[in-house]
């Protein structure tokens, strides 16, 4: 991954996790929130850092750190971004085979709501693997939300602004019974 500058967000993790971030800092920029501020705020912190310190950046890839995204898929999203820099690139999982019920349920509900609200069909609204041009940083920073709602708001705002979506099929990875996901259907 020599062409990538990696930014890791420590979003208020406990002291017991500090060795993980110290190890990450050997190969990445680690930005820290002293208290948990939410996924959306973490993404915005990274975007603000890029805007201020990495002005030569051409594109941004966002990947969750929950073990559900393979390096190969991150690279495929990056390649799609190079060929379609005017679109929001989404690494979309194919929900077939043994998929945890809460994942299938959650994605089906949000797909329906998003399609109804935005008039655009997306196969995986909950994907944490996305890419976009650095030209969109100011726009992304203006999207409302500091927690998980930021990602859905990002999709809604992109649809409203006429930013098209480009889906890249990615492998569906679940660890255990999907304990790494924080989606709660109730």
Predicted segments, located by residue:
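Residue-level signature of catalytic and energy-coupling elements of molecular machines
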Residues: 46, 66, 133, 158, ...
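A conserved acidic beta->alpha catalytic loop
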Residues: 10-18, 67
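Acceptor/aglycone-binding surface of glycosyltransferases and processive sugar-polymer synthases
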Residues: 29, 34-37, 41-49, 71-148, ...
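Short beta-strand-to-loop acidic/aromatic patch adjacent to the donor-nucleotide binding site
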Residues: 56-68
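Short loop->beta transition adjacent to catalytic acidic/histidine clusters or analogous donor-positioning motifs
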Residues: 1-7, 28-29, 58
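Hydrophobic helical membrane-anchoring modules
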Residues: 23, 143-186
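Conserved beta-strand segments of alpha/beta enzyme cores
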Residues: 5, 29-30, 121, 164-166
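Short, high-confidence coil segments that cap the C-terminus of an alpha-helix
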Residues: 55-57, 84-88, 163
């Amino acid at each position: 991954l020599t062409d990538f500058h990696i930014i890791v967000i420590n979003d208020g993790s406990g002291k017991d996790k500090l060795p993980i971030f110290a190890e990450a800092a050997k190969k990445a920029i680690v930005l820290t929130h002293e208290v948990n501020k939410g996924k959306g705020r973490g993404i915005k912190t990274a975007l603000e850092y890029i805007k201020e310190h990495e002005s030569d950046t051409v594109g941004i890839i966002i990947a969750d750190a929950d073990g559900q995204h393979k390096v190969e898929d991150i690279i495929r999203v990056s390649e799609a971004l190079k060929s379609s820099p005017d679109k929001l690139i989404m690494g979309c999982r194919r929900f077939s085979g043994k998929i945890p019920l809460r994942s299938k349920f959650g994605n089906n509900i949000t797909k329906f709501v998003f399609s109804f609200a935005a008039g655009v069909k997306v196969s995986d609204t909950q994907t944490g693997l996305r890419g976009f041009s650095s030209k969109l940083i100011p726009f992304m920073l203006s999207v409302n939300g500091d927690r998980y709602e930021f990602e859905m708001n990002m999709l809604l705002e992109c649809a409203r602004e006429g930013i098209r979506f480009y889906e890249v099929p990615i492998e569906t990875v679940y660890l255990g019974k999907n304990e790494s996901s924080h989606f709660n259907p109730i």
